Amino acid sequence: MMKRTLLWTAGCAVIVMALACLPLKAQQAMTEGNASPAERPKGKSFAKPDDAAAAIYAAARRNDEAEMLAILGPDAKDIVVWNDDANEREQQRAQFAQKYERMHRLMREPDNTVALYVGAENWPFPIPIVEYKGAWYFDAALGRQEIRYRQIGRNEMEALEVCRALVDAEKEYYANAHAYTAKFISTNDVHDGLYWKSMNDGGKSPIGPYLAHAGVESDGGRAEPFHGYYYRILLEGSEGFAIVAYPAMYRSSGVMTFIMNPDGTAYENDLGEQTATIAKQISSAHSNDSWKKVE
């Protein structure tokens, strides 16, 4: 369960070459289809998939961004330089190289691409190796799509953790106020929401500012997404509540919308292109049959 300390931070930056393999409900919900036929490579070509894998490993081990860009192609700069923190990028590449050295293997996938798996946990490198006229290269376009799928999956998993944290926050608030609240941010010095600026005599609020500003208030105030999701609190009479989490950008930051009850039971639904509009209109946790329990 997410601890309060996690809610008081902005969270980790999105790492495009993250070393965590996520199960992706989001990918199943996508309708973009399978890999398209290989196109003329924009980066380096290799005689064998093994050579391509060895080349990307060597470049990562040296932290050679110019060589990585040469291997992946000029259009892959957003993949090679995925944030402004050079130290973080170097650290992630070193971890990838260590996993590669520990164990690596290549596997031909059903779509005829070749996937590179590294480490004892068999982490799949997101950029596939594809064939074009007898030569092999990394397809950065397909890799960029896979990276997006993984980030969506990561956001959805984090959204569920945030919902659990908000359930705990509501219960903490109730212990002091003897009532639940639908507000994320308190009004001035009145503790009528889950977040307030700490005062000498006011104690620490149940949630921190970053999550608080991801809350969509009933008055329509401006919100900022937290790890790609917005949140709402539904009050169920005077003795109950539910948490709603929906993606800030459908099919980009997330796919599924979630509703979580006070006991931690969660339900999910793909609300489609009108996700934001529909999610803002949800008024009860008593969902219809289109909502499926999250296992």
PLM ranges: what are they?
Residues 175-249, 253-256, 260, 270:
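Extracellular/periplasmic head regions of type IV pilus-like filament subunits
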Residues 1-12:
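Bacterial N-terminal signal peptides that target proteins for export
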Residues 114-157, 164, 265-271, 275:
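Short beta-strand edge/turn micro-motifs at domain boundaries
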Residues 64-76, 183-185:
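Short, well-ordered alpha-helical segments enriched in acidic and aromatic residues
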Residues 10-20:
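Bacterial N-terminal signal peptides
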Residues 27-62, 142-168, 172:
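Short, low-complexity N-terminal intrinsically disordered segments enriched in polar/charged residues
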